[in-house]
Amino acid sequence: MSLNFLDFEQPIAELEAKIDSLTAVSRQDEKLDINIDEEVHRLREKSVELTRKIFADLGAWQVAQLARHPQRPYTLDYVRLAFDEFDELAGDRAYADDKAIVGGIARLDGRPVMIIGHQKGRETKEKIRRNFGMPAPEGYRKALRLMEMAERFNMPIITFIDTPGAYPGVGAEERGQSEAIARNLREMSRLSVPVICTVIGEGGSGGALAIGVGDKVNMLQYSTYSVISPEGCASILWKSADKAPLAAEAMGIIAPRLKELKLIDSIIQEPLGGAHRNPEAMAASLKAQLLADLADLDVLSKDDLKNRRYQRLMSYGYA
């Protein structure tokens, strides 16, 4: 897969272009008198070191760009890589099947679990079909239906958060967007089965929180979680989206800051360069964290789970 490089990764992109060029020359003419393998190896090492140096000092805006990377793994990628026997379940049994939310039953290391997550889509047609990962009310009602099913069958719930926010269209508002989100918050706080939530990309406002009330809340290293996008915040405060980098720093949208504020429990480290560089390794780390979280929650009673989760939700907004 050819990598898409972000603006701040251009020095890495230039090195990788040199490596690709040398590799192509080597393949085209195997009778070259010169051995370029050593030079390719040297450039690869230099690329790794440069990547390590750049990623050691990322700002919040750069992390926000990584969270939106077009090649970043989405919910269905992690379902394929970390789970077995996934059976997707569709529809809210009231209006429609919202493709921006996917969900179904799968096995995690042999154990049945209910998976629910946002799905953005990659190609243009799929992005439109998934509404760019912005759910309508029927998406959140589908999610709630699956959560209630999981409770009936005593299955842990695992959610993957990756959305710029709930869809703000007129039709969505007419069908009760705010009510659907609010109902999910209330009902998730009352579930008697373990709930583990992981932000895998963008965690945008109520659209993220509507499937984000859990006993354990994790974030991938280069994901974000905020009440509004940096561009939206900048447009309100400075009347210009160009101030988005400044807004991103001020909002505290990155995982270390959110863990410091006790809004999340764990930060799952990503492969060097981000999850899109090695989805398989990222899925393995994510799976290990989910299994560890389930082991911690299995020893708690149903009442303890509900009480702890409710108190956690009520603590949001307090320093």
Swiss-Prot record:
Pfam hit, one: ACCA
UniProt catalytic activity: N(6)-carboxybiotinyl-L-lysyl-[protein] + acetyl-CoA = N(6)-biotinyl-L-lysyl-[protein] + malonyl-CoA
Domain of life assignment: Bacteria
Key word Lipid metabolism present: yes
The protein's annotated pathway: Lipid metabolism; malonyl-CoA biosynthesis; malonyl-CoA from acetyl-CoA: step 1/1
UniProt subcellular location: Cytoplasm
UniProt record, GO biological process: fatty acid biosynthetic process; malonyl-CoA biosynthetic process
Gene3D superfamilies: 2-enoyl-CoA Hydratase, Chain A, domain 1 (3.90.226.10)
E.C. no: 2.1.3.15
Main location: cytoplasm
Top-rank EC class of the record's enzyme: transferase
One GO CC term, this protein: acetyl-CoA carboxylase complex
Keywords: ATP-binding, Cytoplasm, Fatty acid biosynthesis, Fatty acid metabolism, Lipid biosynthesis, Lipid metabolism, Nucleotide-binding, Transferase
The UniProt record lists the keyword Protein biosynthesis: no
Single annotated GO MF: carboxyl- or carbamoyltransferase activity
Coiled-coil stretches: none
CoA carboxyltransferase C-terminal domain: residues covered: 35-296
Family: Belongs to the AccA family.
Purpose: Component of the acetyl coenzyme A carboxylase (ACC) complex. First, biotin carboxylase catalyzes the carboxylation of biotin on its carrier protein (BCCP) and then the CO(2) group is transferred by the carboxyltransferase to acetyl-CoA to form malonyl-CoA.
Subunit structure: Acetyl-CoA carboxylase is a heterohexamer composed of biotin carboxyl carrier protein (AccB), biotin carboxylase (AccC) and two subunits each of ACCase subunit alpha (AccA) and ACCase subunit beta (AccD).
Protein name as annotated: Acetyl-coenzyme A carboxylase carboxyl transferase subunit alpha
Phylogenetic lineage: Bacteria, Pseudomonadati, Pseudomonadota, Gammaproteobacteria, Enterobacterales
Gene: accA
